[in-house]
C-alpha cells in the first residue's frame, strides 16, 4: 500500500501502474479488513499500520485530484473503529497476536479517536471490559490461520490488565521485529492457563517454515464467548478446545469486573469433556499453570501467606493485590519486548493439578491495596 501511495505521487508516468494497483487493492481489502474493522491477522498493530498506509494513499490520491475508491474509504472507516477499540487507557495498543503496543503519540497519529464515540465491547475476536480503575482486554477467538498466521500466537484466552491507566499484566509483546525466539508465540509466554509443557499450536519449523514462513499450525479452532452486562458489573465467560484432544479437558475462564467494588474476580477451570475419557495422553493427574506476565515497570512480591502477590508500579502509591486459591504461587523471571528489544520482567505462576475425571478450578481476584480496600 505504501508503494502504491508513492506511485500515486509520481505523476503521469505511474498512471497505468496506479490503476492496476488500485484494482488489486480493491480485491484485497475485503479479505484483509474484516467487517468489524479488524485485520485478518487479528493483530491490533497490523490494523494500525494498515490504517496509516491507507490514509497515506488517500492523501496521495487527493493531491492528484483523484477520488479514492469506495472500498478504500470504507476500509479506512472500519479500521479507524477497530483502532479506537484497541486503544487502551494508556493510549497504546494491546500486545497480542504478534504486535507491540506502540507509543501513545504514535497511535494517536492515526486519528482513530477523533470521533469521540465510546469503543464497542468486542471486535476482531477480542473482549474489552472497562471499569473505574481497571481495564481488561482478552483474546477471545482462535488465532489467524494459513498465510495470515505467520505472526499469530497460540495463546488462548490471554488477558492484559491495566490499573489506573498503567499496564499491570501484559503479554511477552513478541513481534516479528523482536529479537526473541518463536517459542514466545506459545501458550506459556502469555497470561493464561497451560498444561504441563504442552502447546496448543506452534509455528512451522525447518524446511516447511523456510518454504511457507513460520505459520501457526495445530492451533485450537473453537472459542466460545458469553458476555453479560448489568449496572455496575461486567461478566465474560470463555472456553476453548485446545486441550481436548490430548488431555480431554476444556479450559474455561470467567472474568467478572465489579465496577462498584473496583475489583476483578477471575476463575480458571479445566473441565473434563468426557469424564470416562482421558485424551490421547492418558493421564489421570494433569499438572497445569496459570501465568500472569507482569509488565516490566511493575514489581511483584509474595506476601507472608505465600500465595497473595502485591503488584506495584514505581509511581503507584498502593499497588494491587492478586489473591488466589491455587495449590501454590511463585514469582519467576520472564521477558518482555519493547521496540523489539528484550527487557527483564517477572511472571506470577499459579500451580495446580487436575484429575482426569473431575478437573480442577482456581479462583483469583485483583483488588486495590489502598487502605480500606482489598
Label each region the model flagged.
Residues 34-174, 345:
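Carbohydrate-active enzyme catalytic cores, enriched for enzymes
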Residues 1-45, 49:
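Active-site lining segments of carbohydrate-active enzymes
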Residues 279-334:
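Polysaccharide-binding surfaces and accessory modules of carbohydrate-active proteins
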Residues 12-13, 63-64, 275:
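Secondary-structure transition/capping motifs at alpha-helix termini
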Residues 108-299:
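Catalytic and substrate-binding regions of extracellular carbohydrate-active enzymes
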Residues 323-374:
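Beta-strand-rich recognition/accessory modules
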Residues 127-129, 234-240, 302-314, 322, ...:
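Generic recognition of long tandem-repeat/solenoid scaffolds
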Residues 239-244, 269-274, 312-318, 325-327, ...:
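Secondary-structure transition/turn motif
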Amino acid at each position: 500500500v505504501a508503494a502504491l501511495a508513492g506511485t500515486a505521487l509520481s505523476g503521469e508516468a505511474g498512471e497505468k501502474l496506479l490503476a492496476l494497483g488500485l484494482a488489486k487493492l480493491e480485491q484485497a481489502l475485503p479479505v484483509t479488513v474484516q467487517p468489524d474493522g479488524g485485520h485478518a491477522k487479528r493483530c491490533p498493530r497490523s490494523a494500525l499500520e494498515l490504517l496509516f498506509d491507507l490514509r497515506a494513499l488517500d492523501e496521495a490520491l487527493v493531491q492528484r485530484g483523484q477520488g479514492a475508491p469506495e472500498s478504500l474509504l470504507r476500509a479506512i472507516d472500519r479500521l479507524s473503529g477497530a483502532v479506537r477499540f484497541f486503544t487502551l487507557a494508556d493510549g497504546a495498543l494491546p500486545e497480542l497476536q504478534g504486535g507491540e503496543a506502540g507509543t501513545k503519540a504514535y497511535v494517536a497519529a492515526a486519528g482513530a479517536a477523533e470521533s469521540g464515540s465510546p469503543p464497542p465491547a468486542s471486535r476482531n475476536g477480542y473482549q474489552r471490559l472497562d471499569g473505574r480503575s481497571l481495564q481488561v482486554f482478552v483474546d477471545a477467538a482462535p488465532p489467524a490461520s494459513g498465510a495470515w498466521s505467520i505472526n499469530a500466537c497460540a495463546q488462548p484466552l490471554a488477558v492484559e490488565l491495566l490499573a489506573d491507566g498503567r499496564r499491570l499484566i501484559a503479554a511477552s509483546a513478541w513481534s516479528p521485529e523482536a529479537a526473541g525466539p518463536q517459542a514466545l508465540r506459545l501458550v506459556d509466554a502469555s497470561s493464561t492457563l497451560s498444561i504441563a509443557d504442552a502447546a496448543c499450536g506452534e509455528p512451522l519449523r525447518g524446511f516447511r517454515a523456510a518454504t511457507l514462513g513460520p505459520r501457526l499450525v495445530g492451533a485450537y479452532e473453537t472459542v466460545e464467548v458469553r458476555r453479560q452486562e448489568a449496572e455496575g458489573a461486567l461478566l465474560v465467560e470463555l472456553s476453548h478446545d485446545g486441550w481436548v484432544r490430548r488431555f480431554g479437558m476444556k479450559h474455561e475462564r470467567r472474568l467478572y469486573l465489579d465496577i462498584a467494588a473496583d475489583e476483578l474476580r477471575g476463575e480458571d477451570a479445566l473441565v473434563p469433556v468426557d469424564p470416562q475419557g482421558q485424551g490421547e495422553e492418558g493421564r489421570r493427574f494433569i499438572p497445569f499453570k496459570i501465568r500472569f506476565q507482569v509488565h516490566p515497570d511493575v514489581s511483584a512480591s509474595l506476601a507472608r501467606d505465600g500465595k497473595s502477590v502485591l503488584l506495584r508500579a514505581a509511581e503507584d502509591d498502593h499497588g494491587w493485590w492478586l489473591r488466589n486459591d491455587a495449590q501454590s504461587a511463585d514469582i519467576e523471571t520472564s521477558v518482555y519486548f519493547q521496540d523489539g528489544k528484550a527487557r527483564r520482567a517477572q511472571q506470577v505462576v499459579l500451580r495446580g493439578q487436575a484429575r482426569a475425571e473431575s478437573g480442577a478450578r482456581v479462583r483469583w481476584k485483583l483488588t486495590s491495596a489502598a487502605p480500606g480496600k482489598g
